[in-house]
A protein has these predicted regions:
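Glycine/tyrosine- and acidic-biased, solvent-exposed loop/turn segments at the edges of beta-strands
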Residues: 18-537
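Bacterial N-terminal signal peptides
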Residues: 7-18
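Bacterial N-terminal signal peptides that target proteins for export
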Residues: 1-7
Length: 537
């Protein structure tokens, strides 16, 4: 609804229309088609025109000659009744002015003659009844104003006349009990106090059944709140204090069994919390302190047998975490510190046999890592430093034979030794970073079948009995590749690997097949000493 009112007083050369006993009318302005645009009714004080007459009504016309509005005038300002019409002659507004200001009840109509709105004024301000209508002429919003502010009842209806909301205002802000509907079904109830939510709060589903019950205090959630579902009734329960979770907390599964129970303190999880599966069996138990996991936590298979037991400190795993098979036997033990794997760990099969054992440091593998086959036979050993292979890595066959030995530094290979089941060499690879700089290959019988490489020459000598004593490959007069030393009876005593004259690996044996000491980058700042028990320095 919009309205615009004009009060026009024009002084000049007037055209008088004398219609006998009717009030005299004076045309003030005409359209270019000769029809009047503005006119006035006046009252003659003595005789003559101008100062001898006063305007008592202003009239405006449409171009088609139909009246637009009439406004009564007193004391040279709008005073009295006001009427207006649409160009078709259908009334559009009715009201009155007092001393130039809107006053009392005003009504507006649409072009079809149906009501559009009603307003009530006092001294130009909204004061009293206020109504908006739909285009079908039915009320839409009904309320009251006091001195331009909503004050009192409020009602909103849909186009079919059904309630949408009911409440009240005080000083232009919501106050008191409010209710909302949709298609005649109540959807929400809320109580206000001077614009703040204060008191019971209810939400209903599409069937009108309760969905949420709670309350507010000073615009903040307070006390017990309940959530409901059609299938199971009470769905969850939470206690608030000053808009924060504070107290008991419960959630239920669709079948009515509990899903979660716990406690809040000032909005933070506290004390023991429990989770349950749909059968009502315990799923997990955790302890909280001021919102952080702190203490023992247990995860279950079926409410009785633990699946995992662990400890938290300041919301981070700390100490030993143990996992179990369904029969209760240990599956793994892992040590944590400040949320990271740090310390010893091991994995076992369902029969209690070791599968893997080692240690972590700040989340990375560090130290010796052992792995087993399903039996008690080792499958591999490896040394790590801060998550990278460092030192010796060995791989064994199920029968216990060494099948592979790898020497690593900072995660990169230095040399790889591969063996046949009978213990003889199968292949030796020398590396510079990830690049292979030499490869030696043997048949299972012990015969070398290496493909000759360009630029590589070999120096060697033998014992007096004809057995090999020494052999080394060179590149550009520098030792490059493998250097061998054998005893008189072909027992390997040492093996060195060079990279263009630089010694990168030194291996020695105290007896045939018995390693003594291995050294990576001997004599250099990054030297790594590997003893017969595969311990790196």
């Amino acid at each position: 609804m919009g309205f615009r009112l004009f009060v026009v007083i024009i002084i000049g050369c007037f055209v008088l229309i004398d219609i006998g006993c009717t009030p005299p009318i004076q045309t003030l302005e005409i359209y270019n088609n000769g029809k009047p645009k503005f006119a006035r009714e006046y009252k003659v004080i003595s005789s003559g025109l101008g100062p001898d007459s006063i305007t008592v009504k202003l009239i405006q016309y449409y171009r088609n000659g139909m009246q637009h509005y009439q406004q009564e005038i007193m004391n040279k300002q709008a005073n009295g009744k006001y009427f207006s019409w649409h160009p078709t002659g259908v009334k559009s507004a009715k009201g009155r002015y007092l001393n130039g200001e809107l006053s009392d009840k005003w009504t507006w109509w649409g072009k079809d003659g149906l009501p559009d709105s009603i307003r009530t004024f006092r001294k130009g301000m909204l004061h009293g009844e206020y109504i908006d209508y739909f285009v079908n002429g039915k009320p839409h919003k009904l309320m009251e104003y006091v001195e331009n502010k909503k004050y009192g009842y409020y009602k909103e209806l849909d186009e079919k006349g059904r309630k949408v909301s009911v409440g009240e205002y005080r000083n232009d802000i919501p106050h008191g009990h409010w209710i909302w509907w949709q298609n005649r079904i109540k959807t929400r109830e809320l109580t206000y106090e001077n614009g703040l939510k204060n008191g019971p709060f209810k939400i209903y589903d599409k069937l009108g059944k309760k969905k949420i019950l709670g309350q507010y205090k000073n615009d903040k959630k307070d006390g017990e709140w309940n959530w409901f579902s059609n299938q199971k009734g009470l769905d969850s329960l939470i206690v608030y204090d000053n808009n924060q979770y504070n107290g008991e907390y419960k959630i239920w599964h669709a079948n009515g069994n509990p899903a979660v129970t716990g406690y809040y303190n000032n909005g933070l999880k506290n004390d023991k919390w429990k989770w349950f599966n749909k059968k009502g069996q315990k799923d997990s138990i955790k302890i909280y302190d001021t919102g952080q996991l702190f203490g023992l936590a247990t995860i279950y298979y079926d409410g009785r047998q633990p699946r995992k037991i662990m400890t938290y400190v300041n919301n981070k795993l700390h100490g030993k975490m143990t996992s179990f098979y369904r029969d209760g036997t240990t599956e793994s033990e892992i040590t944590f510190a400040n949320g990271l794997r740090s310390g010893s760990y091991k994995f076992l099969d369902s029969e209690g046999n070791n599968e893997e054992e080692g240690a972590y440091l700040k989340g990375n593998l560090h130290g010796l890592v052992l792995r087993w086959y399903t039996t008690e036979q080792l499958s591999s050993t490896a040394m790590f430093s801060s998550g990278k292979l460092q030192g010796l890595m060995r791989v064994f066959s199920p029968s216990g034979s060494t099948m592979k030995e790898g020497y690593f530094f900072d995660g990169l290979p230095v040399a790889i030794f591969e063996y046949y089941e009978n213990g003889r060499f199968r292949r030796i690879l020398s590396y510079r970073g990830n690049e292979i700089i030499q490869e030696k290959v043997w048949a299972e019988t012990g015969a070398e079948i290496t493909t000759p490489a360009l630029g590589i020459r070999t120096k060697s000598n033998v014992h007096s009995n004809g057995n090999p004593r020494y052999e080394c490959t060179y590149k550009n007069n520098s030792k490059h590749g493998i250097e061998w030393n054998w005893g008189e009876y072909f027992d390997l005593q040492s093996l060195n690997i060079y990279d263009q004259g630089l010694l990168v690996l030194k291996r020695t044996w105290s007896a045939p097949g018995v390693p003594n000491e291995d050294i990576l980058f001997p004599g250099r700042s990054k030297q790594v000493i590997i003893g017969p028990y595969s311990s790196a320095g």
